[in-house]
Amino acid sequence: MTVAPRIGTATRTTSESDITVEINLDGTGKVDIDTGLPFFDHMLTAFGVHGSFDLKVHAKGDIEIDAHHTVEDTAIVLGQALLDAIGDKKGIRRFASCQLPMDEALVESVVDISGRPYFVISGEPDHMITSVIGGHYATVINEHFFETLALNSRITLHVICHYGRDPHHITEAEYKAVARALRGAVEMDPRQTGIPSTKGAL
């Protein structure tokens, strides 16, 4: 039996941004990313490729003021599209984790497609609060991005930076680790025929 690909879409238009996202959880890593923020585009591309998600993100925001609105609003819409794509959660693995290195940095991500949104981040070095990549991406936004993603997709997400020095490496490892963990958690489990919960609902 052929199963239809799980595709989710979402849009958001405010006075600060106009964002459209489409994600195919059963894709092959094809990406179409344009946010007007080159480093953020790079991170979302890595997210799609390493999650094996077909991912389209088109965003127009007030980047002449700051990247913050565009990054955080993109996380809202991406989370909503993920929730749409995941659907009723029947047959998914639900839990997954990934430890991912990038040179000197090591990041771990743990995901539960729980229906109970929760987010924890720990271990980032203090200079992540003040670092700026490419002149436009303040790494303090990492926490906001992943928290907003977790809340809007209604997942439990833990991100742990075990160690690292370069803000670029830490940030990229975080995006890739979250993508890999999500890929594992939304994967269909041939031994799971129903909702993966003793309660019968997620």
From Swiss-Prot:
Annotated metabolic or biological route of this protein: Amino-acid biosynthesis; L-histidine biosynthesis; L-histidine from 5-phospho-alpha-D-ribose 1-diphosphate: step 6/9
Chief subcellular location: cytoplasm
Top-level taxon of origin: Bacteria
Enzyme Commission number: 4.2.1.19
Cellular component per GO, a single term: cytoplasm
GO molecular function, one term: imidazoleglycerol-phosphate dehydratase activity
Annotated family: Belongs to the imidazoleglycerol-phosphate dehydratase family.
Key word rRNA-binding present: no
CDD domains, A to Z: IGPD
Subcellular localization: Cytoplasm
UniProt gene name: hisB
Enzyme class, first EC level, given as a word: lyase
Protein's UniProt name: Imidazoleglycerol-phosphate dehydratase
One protein family per Pfam: IGPD
UniProt keyword Cytoplasm present: yes
HAMAP family: HisB
Catalysis performed (reactions): D-erythro-1-(imidazol-4-yl)glycerol 3-phosphate = 3-(imidazol-4-yl)-2-oxopropyl phosphate + H2O
UniProt keyword terms in alphabetical order: Amino-acid biosynthesis, Cytoplasm, Histidine biosynthesis, Lyase
Single Gene Ontology BP annotation: L-histidine biosynthetic process
